Amino acid sequence: MKFALIADEVRVSIDSDSDIVAARQKGRELAAQCGFPSTDLAVVATAISELARNIVRYAVRGEIILRLIDDNGRRGVEVVATDDGPGIPDVTLAMQDGYSTSGSLGLGLPGVRRLMDEFEISSDFGKGTTVTARKWKR
């Protein structure tokens, strides 16, 4: 699906905890520019944190790309998390609550899917993962 880009995209390289905080803040700022209410600002920031944390935990480094988008007058925020890490061997399993290969609670990806309005994931084992999530302004 192709959307009109409202503003220049923001790219945040992710390889440490401080980058997670930076991506979260940039995403919150973009969502605020779009006019999201404070509850949705928190939702977008939380989703970005989860995706960035997964990059640090599993892929070591990657990137969060943030965009303000427009779909025939419907405005929103698009978050793309991409990495060249090991990939996810079983995406279906990874999308189940409680599944984790690192001993975490296993709520990250399923949580992002629930928080955002649209969610797509593609992963090539041994090559990396890309997650795209969108939140639309109500």
Stretches with model-predicted labels:
Residues 1-11, 52-138:
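Conserved beta-strand-loop-beta-strand hairpin that lines the nucleotide-binding pocket
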Residues 1-46:
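Bergerat-fold GHKL ATPase/HATPase_c domain
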